[in-house]
Amino acid sequence: MFIDKAKIYVKAGDGGNGCVAFLREKYVPFGGPAGGDGGKGGDIILIADSSLQTLMDFKYKRHYKAERGQHGQGGNKKGKDGEDLILKVPIGTVVKDAETGEIIADLVKKGQSVVVAKGGKGGRGNAAFKSPTNQAPMVAEKGELGEERWIELELKLLADVGIIGFPNAGKSTLISILSKARPKIADYPFTTLTPVLGVLQLDVNDYIVLADIPGLIEGASEGLGLGHEFLRHIERTKFLIHLIDVSDFRERDPIDAFNIINKELEKYSPDLIKKPQIVVANKIDALSDKSLLDNLEKYFSERGYPFVAVSLITRENIDKLINLIRETRDKMKKEEVNESVILGNA
């Protein structure tokens, strides 16, 4: 099961207390103040780790507490600082304050880290309070309390390509063909209840990460069907594969289906509709009137959408689709490079 949300409690370590002590050495019966400071409490730090794919660990353990600083000692000995508690999260984790909703960090790079709760400072020992008017202070500070709060972790899929379409359009079958992913596949809506990641291997060191976004329906932007839970997974994809059912047994007109899904994307976020889309007409093996494909290709080509008709059952035109995915990826990479060059020269 793909867990992409978690709410956890974090409590940094308290600072150690300062010490009240006096120097007691042979031949120095009335030595001065020698109470050491308390150690600092440990921080709680989140760090992005490329080996993790889910937030599953945070489902079973929700409370985290860092070590407190040790108390100061006599002889001006400072207490030992508490150890930081480091929590590893997947790359792409967004960290929010659960109470205010404020975004604390967006961990998008390997090794990127953020302190979510700071340890308390250690209290000063009585040696720090010595003054010309008070040569033997009997006071020391208590350590500060470590920060504590509830935070929310949200993982957005770091996929290059999002596969979208109505339930049963064939998205799970497509990702299983293009990659080694093995999602649950059956002939009823909402078979895929969680996003599935797959990798399309183009060459030894060349691959494209795909995300099978669970079936969307009309009203998804208002939370109907699987709604917001999965619309937000599309946000970080670079482009989309929009699958439509063209079989004789289809439930709706392919163009209507395409436009309904796009309206839901636009309602959720106007930026989503701007993402490039490859339109894939699936189930041509179950289509008797092939002239429909010519009409569809004309319709989508006129609107600037690359179009390919496939059969995921017979694997017809799968190679064409893979080439189209590669071409779209390469074109976007080139545009990104050109844009960065222009910005660099500005």
Swiss-Prot record:
Keywords: Cytoplasm, GTP-binding, Hydrolase, Magnesium, Metal-binding, Nucleotide-binding. One of its GO terms (biological process) is ribosome biogenesis. Mg(2+) binds at S172, T192. Signal peptide: none annotated. Residues 1-158 form the Obg domain. Its cofactor is Mg(2+). Residues 159-330 form the OBG-type G domain. It is found in: Cytoplasm. Its main location: cytoplasm. It holds the Pfam family GTP1_OBG. One of its GO terms (molecular function) is magnesium ion binding. GTP binds at residues 165-172, 190-194, 212-215, 282-285, 311-313. One of its GO terms (cellular component) is cytoplasm. Its EC number is 3.6.5.-. InterPro entries: G_OBG, GTP-bd, GTP-bd_Obg/CgtA, GTP1-OBG_CS, GTP1_OBG_dom, GTP1_OBG_dom_sf, OBG_GTPase, P-loop_NTPase. Belongs to the TRAFAC class OBG-HflX-like GTPase superfamily. OBG GTPase family. An essential GTPase which binds GTP, GDP and possibly (p)ppGpp with moderate affinity, with high nucleotide exchange rates and a fairly low GTP hydrolysis rate. Plays a role in control of the cell cycle, stress response, ribosome biogenesis and in those bacteria that undergo differentiation, in morphogenesis control. Monomer. This is GTPase Obg. It comes from Sulfurihydrogenibium sp. (strain YO3AOP1).
